[in-house]
Each structure stands twice: as structure tokens, then as C-alpha cells.
């Protein structure tokens, strides 16, 4: 992605041209408890409340950093939670971009890293050695790398499972394939058809699937596009035409329409359909495992390999992405900021965050040290899927528009039966209109 002028775009980024220079507050030794003479001060903002399991993990990781680097660095964390609409934290960043009051390090939601980099909000990290980089999952490095430069490292990772009810599949005589031989789209349709009489008798559906407004739809279902050889945006992130509206993508959106038409899924959301035993399958985030274990222990849960196109070439395609740490363009101490980013995304911090929230770590060593990812078949399946097949969401400065457009086409074609080419072409017009400022 080429270097772009500082234009701030939708969702977490403003629409006006701004300057990153300004009068930020100077913090002196003694102003903050623990910050002593001779230490490099590093300010950091995170997107959550302090008094939560996630916030407590971040706070403890910072305390451990300050203990390890006592006399060299001092990290000062500030908690700026998001509100229900996703603002709050991003609003604070927007205002601080304009005033020049950004901290040295911020958390960035993974899909927005490209936009923050393109708009000059974050800068490349100081050089990491190959050994340091090899500690991280490929998906973490891929998500954080723009134009061959590493901008961010994940606080955590994520994945989406194709969950199944073991008792229902056993009743139907269906065997689940191994992770390297997932069901194809065609095979999955045959399985759903086989399950339909059983689920009809339970007043349910073979598949618990919805197309929710917001980030979930592209996060859950973009793999259908990727395994079919499609993309939603060009490699440089600057055009959607010929990508979002391709024949390959049209076939995928029509596939979703078929799921609705054949009544393999409900056209309207049904709360706890899978959890109540009235669906055989469900696509959901890794958090679903803990939800089932804690609240629906009567469900014998399994994780099947995420399904693939009949034309899948064996490449990466499964969902990834979560919050990451990045150094802002405000910082004049990139080496210090990078040390904090490495610490907060590293093994010990990842284990601590898992212990508090059950989120998936960013480093291989963290998985090796957390026995759950070896001993629990469901968590193990999610990790292996992430490790072997994880694919980042589209990298583009207008990612929010791509995400919104994907959900709109899913809903309009899948649920309402509108013409797929018309809906895709209209989405391309909207996406490319947002991209014009980056291609002038």
C-alpha cells in the first residue's frame, strides 16, 4: 500500500486532513508514581476499562514491564473504554490526532491497522530480529505488516469455529473430517440435507447462522470468499472493482442464498438455537467454547474444520484478527515504544491475558505453555486452524466500508434474494468512492 496523505476515514478515523504536531503534555520524573529520573517515559492507551479481567491483565503486564526495565523505561497505561457503539476510545484518538496529544503506544483493532498506517497515525516499529519475529504466529505478522514494514503486534489472536453437536451428528451417522481435509461446499450441502429431517423433528435447523450488522459478518464468513480464490479488495487495498464484484464472489453469495432457500438456516435470528440443541452446526468465535462449557454443559461440543470451496487450493483462509499494539507517529522514542509493544504482545502477557479472558495468544510459546490447547480437543482444533490456515481480513484504508458492504450484500442477496451482481457492483461504487482520496 503506497504512502498516503493524512486523511482520516470512517469509523475510527476522521474525514478531515489533520496535522500530527501539537502541544502534548510533558510528563516529568516524579509526576507519576514509579517514574524516576533517568527512565524513558512511554505513554500507552488501551481500549478497555481497568476494572475488567482484560483491563487487569493489561495493568499487570505493564507493572511487570516496569519491574523488568526499572531504571531504563517506565510505561504509563491509561484506560479509555469503547462505548456500546464502538466510539469512546476511537473518538479520543481522533481528537488527539488533531491536537497532537497521542500517546507513544496505542491499541488498534487488527483490521484497522492498514487504515491507521495509511493515514499516518502509527509508524513502523523498530526493527525486530528474525528470531523475535519467529515467536509470533504467521497471522499476527501478516496482520501487522503493511508494505513489508511491521506496524503492529497482536495483544491476542482469534478464530471462528464450525461448532457441532456431537450427539446430533452421531444420530445422523456423520463423521467429521480432519483439519487438512475439510468438507467442501458441496459436501456440506449434502450433510445439511441429511440433517434436515432430524432437525425438523426438533423444531430446529441444521445450521445456526445469521448475518449480523457490524464486524461479525465479514469476520465469520470472508473465508468462503478466500477458499474460493476470491478477494474483496486489490492487493494494494486501493480498488474493489474486479475483486469484490467478481464471478467467484457472486458464486459465494449465491451459496448463502441457497442455505436460506433450502431452509438449512433460519431467515431470522433465533436466540440460542445451537445452545438449546436445535441446530447441528454453528459458526461462532472461539468464545463459544467457554460459553458452552460454562452455561450449556449438556451439549457435547465439537469443532469441525472450517468448510472450503470445491476449488480450494489448500491455502490460508480461516478467520483471524484482534486487538494489537502499535507505536504512534507522535512518539520520538520508537525503540522504547517497540520494547513495550513486544512486551505487551509477548509470551508472558499473552498467557496472562488468556488466564483472565480465555483469549487466544499471539505467540507459539504461549500455546506450548498453556496445557488447554493440547489437552482440550476443541481449543486444540481452534489453535491448529489458526496456526495452519489463518488469513487476515482485507488490508485497505477504507476497511470499514468493505466490512459494511460485505454484510449488506450478504443480507440483500442471502436473505432478500436481490440480484447478486447488482448488489456487488453497487458496493464497489461505494467502496471506490471512499478510496478516491487515496488514489488522487
Where are the predicted features?
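Periplasmic solute-binding protein
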Residues: 116-121, 140-178, 210-237, 319-327, ...
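Long, aromatic- and glycine/proline-rich binding clefts that accommodate carbohydrate-like moieties
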Residues: 143-144, 297, 304, 355-408, ...
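Conserved N-terminal structural module of periplasmic/extracytoplasmic solute-binding proteins
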Residues: 6, 20-115, 130-133, 269, ...
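Glycine-centered hinge/linker elements that transmit conformational signals in sensory
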Residues: 189-194, 230-231, 235-267
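Bacterial N-terminal signal peptides
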Residues: 9-19
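Extracytoplasmic/periplasmic substrate-binding proteins
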Residues: 45-47, 54-57, 61-62, 218-223, ...
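Alpha-to-beta junction loops
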Residues: 97-108, 121-123, 202, 276-284, ...
Amino acid at each position: 500500500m503506497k504512502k498516503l496523505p493524512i486523511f482520516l476515514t470512517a469509523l475510527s478515523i476522521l474525514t478531515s486532513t489533520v496535522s500530527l504536531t501539537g502541544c502534548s503534555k510533558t510528563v516529568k520524573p516524579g509526576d507519576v508514581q514509579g517514574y524516576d529520573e533517568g527512565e524513558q517515559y512511554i505513554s500507552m492507551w488501551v481500549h478497555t476499562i481497568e476494572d475488567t479481567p482484560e483491563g487487569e491483565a493489561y495493568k499487570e503486564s505493564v507493572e511487570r514491564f516496569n519491574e523488568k526495565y526499572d531504571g531504563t523505561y517506565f510505561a504509563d497505561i491509561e484506560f479509555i473504554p469503547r462505548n456500546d457503539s464502538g466510539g469512546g476510545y476511537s473518538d479520543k484518538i481522533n481528537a488527539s490526532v488533531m491536537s497532537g496529544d497521542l500517546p507513544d503506544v496505542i491499541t488498534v483493532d487488527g483490521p484497522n491497522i492498514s487504515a491507521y498506517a495509511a493515514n499516518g497515525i502509527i509508524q513502523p516499529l523498530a526493527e525486530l530480529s528474525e528470531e523475535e519475529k519467529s515467536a509470533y504466529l504467521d497471522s499476527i505478522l501478516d496482520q501487522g505488516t503493511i508494505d513489508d514494514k511491521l506496524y503492529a503486534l497482536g495483544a491476542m489472536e482469534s478464530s471462528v469455529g464450525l461448532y457441532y453437536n456431537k450427539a446430533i451428528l452421531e444420530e445422523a451417522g456423520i463423521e467429521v473430517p480432519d483439519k487438512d481435509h475439510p468438507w467442501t461446499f458441496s459436501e456440506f450441502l449434502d450433510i445439511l440435507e441429511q440433517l434436515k429431517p432430524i432437525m425438523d423433528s426438533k423444531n430446529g435447523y441444521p445450521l445456526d447462522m445469521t448475518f449480523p450488522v457490524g464486524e461479525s459478518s465479514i469476520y465469520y464468513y470472508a473465508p468462503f470468499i478466500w477458499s474460493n480464490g476470491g478477494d474483496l479488495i486489490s492487493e494494494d487495498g486501493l480498488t474493489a472493482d474486479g475483486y469484490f464484484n467478481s464471478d467467484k464472489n457472486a458464486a459465494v453469495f449465491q451459496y448463502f442464498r441457497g442455505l436460506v432457500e433450502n431452509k438449512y438456516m433460519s431467515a431470522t435470528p433465533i436466540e440460542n438455537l445451537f445452545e438449546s440443541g436445535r441446530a447441528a452446526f454453528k459458526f461462532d468465535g472461539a468464545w463459544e467454547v467457554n460459553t458452552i462449557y460454562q452455561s450449556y454443559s449438556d451439549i457435547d461440543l465439537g469443532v469441525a474444520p472450517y468448510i472450503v470451496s470445491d476449488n480450494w487450493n489448500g491455502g490460508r483462509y480461516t478467520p483471524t484478527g484482534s486487538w494489537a499494539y502499535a507505536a504512534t507517529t507522535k512518539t520520538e522514542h520508537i525503540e522504547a515504544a517497540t520494547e513495550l509493544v513486544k512486551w505487551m504482545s509477548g509470551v508472558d502477557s499473552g498467557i496472562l491475558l488468556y488466564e483472565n479472558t480465555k483469549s487466544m495468544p499471539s505467540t507459539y510459546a504461549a500455546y506450548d505453555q498453556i496445557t488447554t490447547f493440547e489437552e482440550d480437543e476443541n481449543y486444540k482444533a481452534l489453535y491448529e486452524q489458526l496456526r495452519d490456515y489463518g488469513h487476515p481480513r482485507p488490508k485497505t484504508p477504507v476497511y470499514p466500508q468493505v466490512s459494511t458492504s460485505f454484510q449488506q450484500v450478504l443480507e440483500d442477496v442471502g436473505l432478500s434474494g436481490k440480484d447478486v451482481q447488482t448488489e456487488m457492483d453497487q458496493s464497489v461504487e461505494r467502496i471506490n468512492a471512499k478510496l478516491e482520496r487515496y488514489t488522487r
